[in-house]
Amino acid sequence: MPALLKRLLFQVGPHPNERTFTLSSVSTDGHYISLRPFVKPSGDELSFPFEWAFAGTNETVKANDQGNGVVTQDFNFWLDTNVYLNVPNTHRGEVNTTWKNWDSGCVEETGAVYPFGADKESVSFRELWQPVDPSREDLVIVSPNNEKFSSNARSIVLKVTDEAYDGLVIVIGRWIQGFLSQKNNNTIEGLNFIRLLEKDSGKSEFLLSYGKEVNKIPQSYENLKKGSTVTSNGLNWEVIEYHA
């Protein structure tokens, strides 16, 4: 079933913190995107106000159920903004993570990255996630007792098919997140992100819009079917998943 997760905590070292409004979308078929914009960017962050963003299709993640509410997930991201921008001391290659369900309904993610090289010292991290109901306009907590709400949410995924771009849009219930990146650019000028919320009125509200080419990202998701093509300002997107 699809999932929408809000991050509550991020920890590297002894001091936990959370400076972002991070939402991760996971489709029914396992495609995913995580956008992590700063709440109060400052200084150099103003030009690119994101801690990080990544995305991928289900071909870029391997998930294994370990039992007792524990799942391992190994990612080879399609988009990794740190890699795209050639940020110094960036982990490259597969990221191994472990996800543990808490009785409260929260999900703890732990793992380690190797920013200085695979043969160098690792850096451990910890994140805490709260599942929210994607069929609601407000951020309503999903507990173990009401997961039926999220299981009934629509799950639609579009992927760009143009040779000059990579792109993915994931619609989970009312919540939409997407990215579009220019191939072979590797600067912030080549990155575009959206986060949309469909309101009770039927209109969509931009919660996040970044980049000079966001108008090439589809922003209407009616009358679609799997395998169909959507054109947005000259850019073709294929519907690779449709559950509604």
Swiss-Prot record:
Present with 15400 molecules/cell in log phase SD medium. The gene is HRI1. It comes from the Eukaryota. Unknown. Non essential. Interacts with HRR25. May interact with SEC72. Its main location: cytoplasm. The modification Phosphoserine is found at S143. One of its GO terms (cellular component) is cytosol. This is Protein HRI1. It is found in: Cytoplasm; Nucleus. It holds the Pfam family HRI1. Belongs to the HRI1 family. GO terms for biological process: protein targeting to membrane.
